[in-house]
Amino acid sequence: MLFGCPRNVFYGHEKFMDMDKGRIQSLIKDYPDFPKQGILFRDLTPVFRDGHSLAFLGEYFYENFKNTHIDYVAGIEARGFVLSTVLGLKFNRGVLMIRKAGKLPGNTVKQKYDIEYGNAIMELQHESIKKNEDILIADDLLATGGTAFAAAKLIEELGGNVIGFAFVVELSALGGGKLLREKGYSVHSMVVY
């Protein structure tokens, strides 16, 4: 039951799916020249503030991955934590947090990756994944794919299987979706610019 309607009534028709995708797209706010000149920042904060949109994100990605075995949903710091929590609840699975270096206690595995102005390191607690567990990676936005690919390598280094990626937004001109798909990953993006 969702919003007083059985799921198959509310989401069973393409019209409702398109309306809700349109609602999400309309909530995304653009900030030109942020965080620096020449960058168009797509802010998903209004999407995450809207309860209807959060529920729809869960439904949308559930439909894309419902026939896929998932042990955990991994969120990439920080906005990926919101989507991974929504999906973890929807799939009744735990959530893993992929964080910037130095933010997790205990033994961690680290992965270096390139960013616009240099490089950074992300990490995951070593005991988070057992060999051959199936992990869905979630993040708010896919741009060049460097962060997402580094997250996949981190999970694979621990013996996990990356069964797919879920992104609210994909910036197709920056090539991240192409990169991940060429590496053999399943990529699902709700809104593609």
Segments (PLM) and residue ranges:
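PRPP-associated nucleotide enzymes
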Residues: 1-193
